[in-house]
Amino acid sequence: MERKAVVVGGTGLVGGYVVRELLVQKEYTRVMVMGRRPLDIKHPKLEQALIDWEQPQKSTFALEGVDDVFCCLGTTMKKAGSKERFRQVDLDYPVLTAQLGKEAGAVQMLAVSAMGADPDSRVFYNRTKGEAEEALAAIGLPALHLFRPSLILGARSERRFGEAAATVVMKALDGLMTGRLASYRAIPASFIARAMVRIALAQASGVHIYPNDIIRVIGAELTSDDKEAGTGTTPDDNV
């Protein structure tokens, strides 16, 4: 069955991997990327549409015929500049995406959240992520899949010095993180993307939450199709 995927946040680290994973899947005949700037990628299945979050209704044409919506939006407090702007990117925009997707007839949404997401958390970041999860679930899509990764590894287009330092530490400690600590291991962005696409293809209904260790299991193992398509490991995949 031919499927159309829409990716919001496709210019980011995880989103970029999601786009590449989708393009090599035979089940997806159309891959639409909605963002504020275009991707520098050419592919016969790839379509792109610029979105103005102040006037999102002007971009609803991009969602026509959508089956699966992948939301990979996210920022940092440093980049956002304020708590209000952070909530806008990490909560308001994903919820708006889900609403537009439902109106367009989307069957499922797959969204990147974060480890520790909790609407009752005292930590602003975790609380915002938890509130976003609750709001997404309340929209009532046939299926909602929420992914809660730990520190995400990969080459970003912008420098995040705090994350860079944490990455060095997490890589050094990775071999020591066993037992209960294993669930906190940093995870390559490619693993998250691969897990999201595989879960989408399974087409399970309802609301599902995937913690970091489960994401790693689903996204780590390459299938014969992955190998033939050339979506193999990156340097960070061995973490």
Language-model segments: which ranges?
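Residues at the starts of beta-strands that form the adenosine-phosphate
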Residues: 4, 28-30, 47, 107-108, ...
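Oxidoreductase cofactor-interface core, primarily capturing Rossmann-like NAD(P)-dependent enzymes
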Residues: 24-27, 44, 119-223
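N-terminal Rossmann NAD(P)H-binding glycine-rich loop of SDR-like oxidoreductase domains
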Residues: 3-25
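SDR active-site strand-loop-helix element
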Residues: 8, 34, 72-73, 109-115, ...
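NAD(P)H-binding glycine-rich loop region in Rossmannoid oxidoreductase-like domains
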Residues: 5, 40, 47-96, 100-103
